[in-house]
Each structure stands twice: as structure tokens, then as C-alpha cells.
Curated annotation (Swiss-Prot):
Residues 119-256, 282-325, 339-392 are annotated as: Disordered. Its main location: nucleus. The gene is Coil. Residues 144-159 have a biased composition (Basic and acidic residues). GO terms for cellular component: Cajal body; female germ cell nucleus; nucleus. It comes from Mus musculus (Mouse). There is a cross-link at K127, K151, K204, K209, K271, K278, K294, K493 (Glycyl lysine isopeptide (Lys-Gly) (interchain with G-Cter in SUMO2)). Residues 457-556 form the Tudor domain. Residues 390-416 are annotated as: 8 X 2 AA tandem repeats of R-G. This is Coilin.
Length: 570
């Protein structure tokens, strides 16, 4: 057996170790026969001072690191070692060996490198796809721009010639103005094919009902006609804020066809609103009374139809413009109040009752023809809201029954409409009357406990000086622990003597009186666990029917006579 080579080491920690958090400097006695390499010494320090098995410790002797694979003989007696807790992510290739040359690369570094490679690949693929899409768009724009240039009117060609002449003869300031105008016209031409492609996509996605009203051929208008239409719309629409918002929401980048269609819709909606306002005073009170008596809903104004068609025809309008239109329509609805019930279906005529929740006749309605101003067939005299919240989605029901199918009132996006305020009056007169007739009563019920049987008066029984014969019944008291584990004299208990030893004065008694209900074991009760998983509880307060006590431990023993049934009870 080799002699033990023990060395005394002074360990200095940067921070207190977990096992002894109050100190950072320690002395350690190490047997070098058990520690072959520095790793063994590190594991010993890790075990002694409560570090986890995954903690990376570094040993430094006079400022130099002791390599983990080096021999532990580097350490001599009374050396001072600095123990430093290394970071987990610093060593990329951590060499952990026990005498051999096996190396284990860090898993986290591998995962990070793998993630970086994946991110680079996805970025490259995304960039190449983006470039491909841009090339296709540029080629399509160039083709459409060339087609548009061939379709220019002769007056525009004359204008361009005059511009060229003025460029040759004009001053430098005029040349700058002409250049800026040319740039703006080029931008418009570039934007037009984009808007056309987007409009065609939106028309393909719409249902056949909407396609009938929106797939009409848009006439190409010259810039002069567009300017005239804009002037007419601005002069004719000063009174109504909703129509002004429509004319303002048509940006210059929108194509000429779209703007001309909007002007036609504006004039049609003006005529419709004028007709409605003529008939409104006669039917306002009747519509308001029907609204209060029957559960239904009203729409804010018929002018929202124009804004709905304009928003569905041009997807290029931003969400902020949509919200601006919606707020204007809501203000109009609040000021105008309840309109005529036949506002949306002006072509049918007749004013019927409001739409109740039980009517199953609403199977759908078609949007109006925006160019010709005629109404599609629909349920007569039915007030329908221009939009419900964010639009009726695919197959969503209106008013809990079979409702309007399809994609609903379309706004920007798929299945989204304008959030126009709708008034739902769901409380009927019968419900109000039922609530008024409800009567609340306060009643108190007295719950009486059952009458307890009267206790026997054992004081009339004869006292016993010695134990009676076997088989006799006695009444006695015992010194027991109460429920709060304090010693106290119990009440009278009835028992039957089973055996009696005259020498030791031990008595076996069978308790005849009822025992208290078993409770969960307390802190003074002993619980024994068996091998089969069962538990045996030894209560501090005795819970057994048969007890063995000394006769002198019985307090106030009395003999129960057979005629004790006639004992008076208190």
C-alpha cells in the first residue's frame, strides 16, 4: 500500500461558495494518491463546497491556469489556489478528459452556428425571390406603359410638342418647372398599371353578385374631363360632408376610370337622398314608433352605399381613409335620426313593419347597380344596415336565423365592412311587462335541531368499593385527554365487566356507551405505516370498545341495577 501524500491547500474564491456563504478563503487537505489529474481536484472542490455538477471551476496558481488534463502533482504543500467559476458559454471546445485525449465541443455553440447558417439560407432565398418578383413587375409595368403611350389622345401629343418648343425657347426657370411636371406625369403613369392589376384581382375575388355591378367597362377620360368632373363634384357637394369625404378620398394616383365611376355614383346618391328627404317628414314618426314597439334595427343613412362601392372598387385606399369615411357616416346617422324604412329599396316602394327577430323571409339581397341607379330585387320594406361591425364574413347569419350569405359588405381586406353604427332594440313589450310584474319576497325559514335524548342521572346508583362480579354493568368515569389534548375527567360511561384479576386488580371492561366520531390523527396521535401501504393510528384519546384498567383508576364507579331503566332523568 502506497504512503498517502497529503498536501494542505489554501483556496481563495471570488464569491462565497454555496456550502459556506459567509467566507471566501478556506484550507483544504487533499490526498494526491486519489487525485491523478487537476479535474479530480476540481470535482473534489465542487463536491466539498456545494457546487452543482455542471459548474465549471478553474484553478489558478500564482495567476496561471491549471489545465484540467494536467497531473495533480503540480500542486504542492501550502500552495494558494484561486478558484474561479467560469462562464458556461465561453469555452467553445471544452476539453474534459480523465487521462485521455477525448474532447467534447460545446452544444450551445453548435446550435448557434446551425441557426446562423439556417438564417443566412432563408435570407438568401427570400432576397432572390424578391428580386424575381421585382423583375416581373417591372417588365409588366413597361409593357403597360408602352400600351398607354400609344393610346394617348392627339391633344396630349400636341401639348407635348408645345412643351418641347417652350423648352427650346424658354428660360431656365421655366425648364425646371417643365421637368417637375414631366416627373409627376411619369409617376402617375407608373402607378396606373399597378392600380389596374389590383382592381382586377379584387374583382376576381368578389362573388358573382358583386361582380355584376363592378366588372363594368371603365371609360378612359382625358385629364381635361377629369378636371371638369372634379370641379363639378366640388361645387355640387358642398352641402353634404359624406360626399365631400368621398371626393377627397380619391387620390391622384387612382386611375381615371375609377374616378369617373365615383362621380356618377355621387350624382346618383344625391338624387336618391333628395327623394328620401322629400318623403321623410311624413314617415319619420311612424318609423320611430315601429322601432320602439318591435325588436329591429335601423341603418344610419343611405349614403353609406356610395362609400361602400367606392371602397370595394379601389383597394388602394388606406385604412385611415376608410375610418374617416365611417366616422363621417356615423355623424350623419346621428344627426338625421331614423330614416324611412324603404331607404335602401327605393325601387319597391311601400313601408312595411320593421324587421322582427322571428321573420325567416330574409334570404339575401343584392347590391344596387352603381352605373344605372336601379335597385336589385330584395325583401320589400325591410330596413337593412349598411354594415354590421367589421362586415359579414363567409356564411355568417344575420339576426340568428338564415341570413345573408356570401362575403358581405366588402371593405379593405377580405370579408370586412365599414363599422357603421346599428341600433338593436331586442327588448319587447312583453319582456318589459314581465320585469315590472316580478315580485321579490323575503322569507325566513327556522331550522330546529332534533331534540336530544335526556341524560341519565347516575348519581342515584349505588357506589362500588370493590370490583363486582363478571357480567355486571357499571357506570364509571376516567381521566382522559380531551379533543384539545388536555387531561380532564370524562362523563359517565357504561361498561360491562368481562374479567377481573383479584391479585393485580386489573379489570377488562367492554364500553357500551357510544364512542365519539373518528377524526383525522392529530399531532399527539401515532400513525404506523405497514408494508402493504395501510396505516394504523394509535390515538392519544382511547377509541377502543374494550379497555383494560386498574380498578383504582376508575373514578366514581357505580353499579347499574336492572331496574335502572326507571331512573329519573334531568
Amino acid at each position: 500500500m502506497a504512503a498517502s501524500e497529503t498536501v494542505r491547500l489554501r483556496l481563495q474564491f471570488d464569491y462565497p461558495p454555496p456550502a459556506t456563504p459567509h467566507c471566501t478563503v478556506f484550507w483544504l487537505l487533499v490526498d494526491l494518491n486519489r487525485c491523478r489529474v487537476v479535474t479530480d481536484l476540481i470535482s473534489l472542490i465542487r463536491q466539498r463546497f456545494g457546487f452543482s455538477s455542471g459548474a465549471l471551476l478553474g484553478l489558478y496558481l500564482e495567476g496561471g491556469l491549471l489545465p484540467p488534463a494536467e497531473s495533480a502533482r503540480l500542486v504542492r504543500d501550502n500552495d494558494s489556489l484561486r478558484v474561479k467559476l467560469e462562464d458556461q458559454g465561453l469555452p467553445e471546445n471544452l476539453i474534459v478528459s480523465n487521462g485521455g485525449d477525448s474532447s467534447f465541443p460545446c452544444r450551445k455553440a453548435k446550435k448557434r452556428a446551425f441557426k446562423l447558417m439556417e438564417d443566412e439560407e432563408t435570407d438568401q432565398g427570400y432576397k432572390s425571390l424578391k428580386k424575381h418578383c421585382k423583375r416581373q413587375e417591372d417588365s409588366g409595368q413597361n409593357e403597360k406603359a408602352s400600351d398607354l403611350e400609344t393610346k394617348l389622345l392627339p391633344d396630349e401629343t400636341g401639348r407635348t410638342k408645345s412643351k418641347k418648343k417652350s423648352k427650346v425657347t424658354g428660360s431656365p426657370a421655366e425648364e425646371d418647372e417643365e421637368e417637375t411636371k414631366k416627373k409627376s406625369s411619369k409617376r402617375k403613369e407608373k402607378c396606373e398599371p399597378k392600380k389596374q392589376t389590383r382592381a382586377s384581382k379584387s374583382s376576381k375575388q368578389q362573388t358573382p353578385k358583386e361582380g355584376a355591378s363592378q366588372n363594368c367597362s371603365f371609360p378612359r377620360a382625358s385629364p381635361r374631363s377629369l378636371g371638369k368632373a372634379r370641379r363639378r363634384s366640388s361645387t355640387g357637394l358642398k352641402g353634404s360632408s359624406g360626399h365631400l369625404s368621398e371626393s377627397e378620398s380619391c387620390p391622384e394616383s387612382v386611375s381615371d376610370g375609377h374616378c369617373s365611376v365615383m362621380m356618377q355614383e355621387v350624382t346618383f346618391s344625391e338624387k336618391l337622398s333628395a327623394e328620401l328627404l322629400k318623403d321623410a317628414p311624413a314617415t319619420k314618426t311612424a318609423a320611430a314608433n315601429r322601432q320602439a314597439s318591435k325588436p329591429g334595427f335601423t341603418f344610419s343613412s343611405g349614403k353609406g352605399k356610395a362609400s361602400r362601392t367606392s371602397s370595394s372598387s379601389s383597394d388602394s385606399s388606406s385604412e385611415s381613409e376608410d375610418q374617416f369615411l365611417v366616422s363621417k357616416n356615423m355623424l350623419e346617422g346621428a344627426s338625421a335620426g331614423f330614416l324611412k324604412p324603404t331607404g335602401l329599396f327605393a325601387g319597391q316602394g311601400g313601408s312595411g313593419p320593421g324587421l322582427s327577430l322571428e321573420t325567416p323571409g330574409i334570404m339575401g339581397w343584392k347590391s344596387s347597380d352603381s352605373n344605372r341607379g336601379r335597385q336589385a330585387p330584395g325583401p320589400p320594406s325591410t330596413p337593412v344596415p349598411t354594415s354590421l361591425g367589421r362586415g359579414w364574413g363567409r356564411g355568417e347569419d344575420l339576426l340568428f336565423g338564415k341570413g345573408l350569405r356570401g362575403r358581405g359588405v366588402r371593405g379593405r381586406g377580405r370579408g370586412r365592412g365599414q363599422a357603421v353604427s346599428c341600433v338593436f332594440n331586442r327588448s319587447s313589450e312583453s319582456q318589459k311587462q314581465r320585469q315590472l310584474n316580478d315580485i321579490l319576497t323575503n322569507s325566513s325559514v327556522v331550522i330546529q335541531n332534533p331534540v336530544e335524548p335526556p341524560k341519565k342521572d347516575y348519581s342515584l346508583l349505588p357506589l362500588l368499593a370493590a370490583a363486582p362480579q363478571v357480567g355486571e354493568k357499571i357506570a364509571f368515569k376516567l381521566l382522559e385527554l380531551t379533543s384539545d389534548y388536555s387531561p380532564d375527567v370524562s362523563d359517565y360511561k357504561e361498561g360491562k365487566i368481562l374479567s377481573h384479576d383479584p391479585e393485580t386488580q386489573q379489570v377488562d371492561i367492554e364500553v357500551l356507551s357510544s364512542l365519539p366520531a373518528l377524526k383525522e390523527p392529530g399531532k399527539f396521535d401515532l400513525v404506523y405505516h405497514n408494508e402493504n401501504g395501510t396505516e394504523v393510528v394509535e390515538y392519544a384519546v382511547t377509541q377502543e370498545k374494550r379497555i383494560t384498567v386498574l380498578w383504582r383508576e376508575l373514578i366514581d364507579p357505580r353499579l347499574i341495577i336492572d331496574s335502572s331503566g326507571s331512573i329519573s332523568s334531568t
